[in-house]
Amino acid sequence: QVMTRPAEEKSVLLSDGTEVILNSESELTYDRNYNKNNRSVHLIGEAYFSVKKGDIPFNVLTPHGKVSVLGTSFNIRARNDGFEVGVNDGEVQVSNENSLISLSKGQLIDVKSEFLSSNIIQIPTNQYPDWLNRKFYCDETTLESLCLEIERTFDIKINFTNPNLKSLTITGLIEASDLDNVLQ
């Protein structure tokens, strides 16, 4: 089991050569027999996976669904509010109790309900995932959602004196190399 605290990232190299980079406030667990009969890991939070090709499928299990691949690079965000999968290279299959959908390079799906939507978004793979590049990419993102990411990234607490501000939306790219930069 590997866990990260707020404002912490960790890189994990699995026994099959797969690299996992855990974002802040995330947890990765896997069996001690990983790579013998299965290549399955459990994720709560967010992580970027660069999966080494192999004969045994690589599976990421989250509270919201499962992602299966043979070898590729992709990001998963599995937090309380839903499940997001974006593919940088290769192809993945995303499934939950009700649906199965395939994604390929440059595609992202954001699942907020029990059904996988066929609403697939095209993403710029050179900017995704934004947290690995020390940026916040916002596309009609609520101020509340952005502030949650800022809190996780910098281990701070942001309070809204006016609750109406939470629903304001932001579109743009914010450099997140340091907190002063973000707050400007």
What are these regions (language model features)?
Residues Q1-Q184:
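A residue-level detector for the "anchor" residue at the start of short, highly conserved motifs
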